[in-house]
């Protein structure tokens, strides 16, 4: 691509977030000049520290500033000193909803040299892309409580599924399936119980699928899908599912592909009306924060996803190759490296590529 300046908002966040983000930026800085890419980064202090100091999670003015960027790189959000849900809903979900991040993209890939808990599984057996709907379902926040504190208390949490919301994420998933060699898409839901939502998803997949005759389509109940993630991971190529089911099966996917320390994600607005946000899926791990023990690989792979989204597929491929080489080296030689050492090694591999 031609020379370009990318405005990148950086949210290190809580716990190990600042440490892993620093290594992601290190690798990004190593690959960017090779592709005519100039970085204009702005760091935002959003997370537990800000909440304790001001009582705010994401001020409106800061949200407006974030809106002006091309992409957002997030480290981790969460702290035991903050009530559960305050940071998650106030920052993560707010950005997903307000920036229309209706695609949550989660690659599930077993790299050579990485250990999986599954017996008899090779790297070529686990290479899938989970496309999770990101702005609807039970996460929409609709519901309520009646007769709270009484023996007759009732709590409801509604799952919202709109035609618009389902169709746009299904279209994205079909487009991805059409690009990949296997040309296969699996819808995961629970339509035998969630009959109204399930029927909508099934109908939309059938209708959109008619536009992609080259893509093979199948369906699995979510409980069956979890079983096949473990027993037959090779049957999956692109998986499309709703917000809740996607949240669950992607963590299972991370586990079978070597652990959550290698799991990258993108919260994507495909049209580019808002900046997409990229983050490792692991938590803030406050128990090891500041000790140099955190593996930054998931953040580095999230940077790769970001570059691919921005149109720099070659740069993304260079990072993927460097990570794959580093993981093979780990398997061969073992040893313990610090967070910064892993970042240094991967950045050096990127710089040395021809």
Curated annotation (Swiss-Prot):
Annotated keywords: Amino-acid biosynthesis, Branched-chain amino acid biosynthesis, Cytoplasm, Leucine biosynthesis, Magnesium, Manganese, Metal-binding, NAD, Oxidoreductase
SMART domains for the chain: Iso_dh
EC nos: 1.1.1.85
Cofactor note: Binds 1 Mg(2+) or Mn(2+) ion per subunit.
Record field: catalytic activity: (2R,3S)-3-isopropylmalate + NAD(+) = 4-methyl-2-oxopentanoate + CO2 + NADH
One cellular-component annotation, GO: cytoplasm
Main location: cytoplasm
Pathway(s) annotated for this protein in UniProt: Amino-acid biosynthesis; L-leucine biosynthesis; L-leucine from 3-methyl-2-oxobutanoate: step 3/4
PROSITE patterns, alphabetized: IDH_IMDH
InterPro entries assigned: ICDH/IPMDH (IPR050501), IsoCit/isopropylmalate_DH_CS (IPR019818), IsoPropMal-DH-like_dom (IPR024084), LeuB_actb (IPR023698)
Site (Important for catalysis): 139, 190
Compartments reported by the entry: Cytoplasm
Cofactor: Mg(2+); Mn(2+)
Gene Ontology annotations of biological process type: L-leucine biosynthetic process
Protein family membership: Belongs to the isocitrate and isopropylmalate dehydrogenases family. LeuB type 2 subfamily.
Protein name: 3-isopropylmalate dehydrogenase
Classification of source organism: Bacteria, Bacillati, Actinomycetota, Actinomycetes, Streptosporangiales
Gene label: leuB
């Amino acid at each position: 691509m031609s020379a370009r300046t990318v405005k990148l908002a950086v949210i290190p966040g809580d716990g190990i977030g600042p440490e892993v983000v620093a290594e992601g930026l290190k690798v990004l800085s190593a690959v960017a000049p090779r592709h005519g890419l100039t970085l204009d980064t702005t760091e935002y202090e959003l997370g537990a520290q800000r909440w304790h100091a001001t009582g705010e999670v994401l001020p409106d003015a800061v949200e407006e500033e974030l809106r002006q960027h091309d992409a957002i790189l997030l480290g981790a959000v969460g702290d035991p000193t903050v009530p559960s849900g305050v940071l998650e809903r106030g920052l993560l979900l707010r950005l997903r909803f307000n920036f229309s991040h209706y695609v949550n993209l989660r690659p599930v890939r077993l790299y050579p040299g990485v250990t999986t808990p599954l017996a008899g599984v090779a790297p070529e057996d686990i290479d899938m892309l989970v496309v999770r709907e990101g702005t609807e379902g039970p996460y929409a926040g609709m519901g309520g409580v009646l007769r709270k504190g009484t023996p007759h208390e009732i709590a409801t949490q509604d799952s919202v599924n709109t035609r618009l919301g389902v169709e746009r994420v299904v279209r994205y998933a079909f487009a991805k399936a059409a690009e990949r060699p296997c040309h296969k898409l699996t819808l995961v839901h629970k339509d035998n119980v969630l009959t109204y939502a399930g029927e909508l998803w099934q109908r939309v997949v059938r209708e959109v699928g008619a536009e992609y005759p080259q893509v093979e389509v199948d369906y699995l109940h979510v409980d069956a899908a979890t079983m096949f993630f473990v027993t037959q991971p090779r049957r999956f190529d692109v998986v499309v599912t709703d917000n809740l089911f996607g949240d669950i099966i992607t963590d299972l996917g991370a586990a079978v592909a070597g652990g959550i320390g290698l799991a990258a994600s993108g919260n994507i607005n495909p049209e580019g009306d808002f900046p997409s946000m990229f983050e490792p899926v692991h938590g803030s791990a406050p128990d090891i924060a500041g000790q140099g023990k955190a593996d930054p690989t998931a953040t580095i792979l999230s940077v790769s996803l970001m570059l691919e989204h921005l149109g720099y597929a070659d740069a993304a491929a260079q990072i993927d190759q460097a990570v794959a080489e580093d993981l093979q080296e780990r398997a061969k030689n073992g040893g313990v490296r610090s967070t910064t050492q892993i970042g240094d090694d991967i950045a050096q591999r990127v710089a040395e590529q021809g």
